[in-house]
């Protein structure tokens, strides 16, 4: 991409994935504009970087545009998409734009059903600590830099490879890290076999000089290993992983473990994050860093001071000895993993969860799994389903989910109709020493922030 005079327009520019690419293009000198139905801190940042931001989608906003970028969240009936077609403006998916940017540098792509953002952040932090100043495109706000994109001067680009719609097959990374494979995104994939087939294609796209970094703890990755033709290494908590963690323990919100590479003990790591899932993510990042010849002492220092990503076990605050934590988890596996990490990090607290289901299609497809995901919570509130542009599905709602959770043995489940009623009950229920975990990929984090204001 060398046409710096291009005017690139993003439909839905405030999205976490779209905004990262937009910010990177701005830093490269392109003219960038875009629209979103809701202005936010993200769109404000883009405006401060030089982007023209429109509130709402209107056809007249794309009249002098060279390229229109969309995502799967944007309908074909969007007025800007229709206008672009009528004007013969080239329209491309977000993934294609990211793929073009990744061609500029030595590309490291991180994919998987869970842990992509955290792992990408860890790799970026380690490479930055090593003085390599990577370009970063990540699906979350990095606490260390306050944004989801960074245009580095170094030779590397580290980016999330989103598998949700198969678009990660557009990338051609030199290093491909896969954190796990899980049953997800069934609005696009037929079944788990279809998902595994796509991951095999992604992994085998790694060139002969590259490397695939694969989690041996995941049963679906275990299943596809015989089909992998790319050079690969494995990581995990398993004794059979090429890069493994030993002697895992937690103290407070920090994890401690020893890294073993084959038969060689590389050394001890103190991870400034809680949860075994984050140790697994750290192992993936360590494997990538070792492939790039980063010294272990640098890796150790980076992980000890890593700040993490917003909305990933993010401590929002504490009032009256009540702690409020927020997490993006919205899949049953993520729910269980996050609750386990909370129990490890805060073992003595009563855990009160406020869960906002995300998408009707996901709730329907994974309904049985959701009913058995919350046993580690002491008290559970379930909010209405966050539609995320979907239409309701008959027979799928939060009340049915609550009933299912209760039928599967959870004794303390409350179905609430909105934020206001949830906050009212919380105010009367919470006690000093409690931990409130807001959980979901929608806007449930706002409830946690409001709760802190009420408790002040």
From Swiss-Prot:
Q: Provide the protein's localization.
A: Cytoplasm
Pathway field of the UniProt record reads: Cell wall biogenesis; peptidoglycan biosynthesis
| Key words, A-Z | ATP-binding, Cell cycle, Cell division, Cell shape, Cell wall biogenesis/degradation, Cytoplasm, Ligase, Nucleotide-binding, Peptidoglycan synthesis
Q: Does the keyword Cell cycle apply?
A: yes
Naming one, the record's GO cellular component terms include: cytoplasm
A Pfam family annotated for this UniProt entry: Mur_ligase_M
Q: What is its EC number?
A: 6.3.2.8
A Gene Ontology BP annotation from the UniProt entry:
peptidoglycan biosynthetic process
Q: Does the keyword Cell cycle apply?
A: yes
Task: Give the enzyme class.
Answer: ligase
Q: Which InterPro entries match?
A: Mur-like_cat_sf (IPR036565), Mur_ligase_C (IPR004101), Mur_ligase_C_dom_sf (IPR036615), Mur_ligase_cen (IPR013221), Mur_ligase_N (IPR000713), MurCDEF_pg_biosynth (IPR050061), UDP-N-AcMur_Ala_ligase_MurC (IPR005758)
Q: Name one GO molecular function term.
A: UDP-N-acetylmuramate-L-alanine ligase activity
What residues does ATP bind to? 112-118
> Which reactions appear under catalytic activity for this entry?
UDP-N-acetyl-alpha-D-muramate + L-alanine + ATP = UDP-N-acetyl-alpha-D-muramoyl-L-alanine + ADP + phosphate + H(+)
- The source's domain of life comes to Bacteria
Q: SUPFAM superfamilies under this entry?
A: MurCD N-terminal domain, MurD-like peptide ligases, catalytic domain, MurD-like peptide ligases, peptide-binding domain
Read off the PANTHER family from this record.
UDP-N-ACETYLMURAMATE--L-ALANINE LIGASE, UDP-N-ACETYLMURAMATE--L-ALANINE LIGASE-RELATED
Q: What does this protein do?
A: Cell wall formation.
Family of the protein in this entry: Belongs to the MurCDEF family.
This protein's name: UDP-N-acetylmuramate--L-alanine ligase
Q: Which gene encodes it?
A: murC
């Amino acid at each position: 991409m060398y046409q710096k005079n291009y005017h690139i327009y993003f439909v839905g520019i405030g999205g976490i994935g779209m905004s990262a690419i937009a910010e990177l293009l701005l830093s490269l000198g392109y003219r960038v504009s875009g629209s979103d139905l809701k202005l936010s801190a993200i769109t404000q940042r883009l405006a401060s970087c030089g982007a023209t931001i429109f509130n709402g989608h209107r056809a007249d906003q794309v009249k002098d545009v060279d390229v229109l970028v969309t995502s799967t969240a944007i309908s074909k009936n969007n007025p800007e998409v229709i206008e672009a077609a009528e004007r013969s403006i080239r329209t491309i998916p977000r993934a294609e734009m990211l793929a073009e940017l990744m061609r500029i540098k030595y590309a490291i792509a991180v994919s998987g059903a869970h842990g992509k953002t955290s792992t990408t952040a860890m790799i970026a932090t380690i490479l930055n600590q090593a003085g390599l100043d990577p370009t970063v495109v990540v699906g979350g706000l990095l606490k260390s830099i306050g944004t989801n994109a960074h245009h580095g001067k170094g030779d590397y680009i580290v980016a999330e490879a989103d598998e949700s719609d198969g678009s990660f097959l557009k990338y051609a990374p030199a290093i491909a890290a896969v954190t796990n494979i899980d049953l997800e995104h069934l609005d696009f994939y037929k079944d788990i076999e279809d998902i595994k087939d796509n991951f095999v294609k992604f992994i085998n796209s790694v060139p002969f000089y590259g490397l695939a970094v694969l989690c041996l703890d995941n049963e679906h990755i275990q299943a596809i290993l015989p089909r992998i033709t790319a050079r690969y290494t494995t990581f995990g908590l398993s004794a059979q992983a090429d890069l493994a963690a030993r002697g895992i323990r937690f103290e407070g919100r920090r994890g401690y473990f020893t890294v073993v590479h084959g038969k060689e003990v590389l050394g001890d790591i103190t991870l400034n994050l809680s949860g075994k899932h984050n140790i697994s993510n750290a192992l993936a990042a360590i494997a990538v860093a070792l492939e790039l010849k980063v010294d272990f002492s640098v890796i150790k220092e980076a992980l000890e001071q890593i700040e993490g990503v917003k909305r990933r076990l993010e401590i929002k605050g504490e009032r009256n000895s009540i702690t409020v934590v927020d997490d993006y988890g919205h899949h049953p596996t993520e729910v269980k993993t996050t609750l386990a990490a909370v129990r490890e990090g805060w073992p003595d607290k009563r855990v009160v969860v406020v869960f906002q289901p995300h998408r009707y299609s996901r709730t329907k497809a994974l309904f049985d799994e959701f009913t058995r995901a919350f046993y580690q919570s002491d008290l559970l509130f379930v909010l209405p389903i966050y539609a995320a542009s979907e239409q309701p599905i008959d027979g799928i709602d939060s009340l049915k989910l609550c009933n299912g959770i209760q039928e599967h043995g959870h004794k303390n489940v409350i179905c609430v109709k909105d934020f206001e009623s949830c906050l009212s009950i919380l105010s009367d229920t919470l006690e000093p020493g409690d931990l409130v975990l807001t959980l979901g990929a929608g806007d449930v984090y706002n409830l946690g922030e409001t709760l802190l204001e009420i408790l002040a």
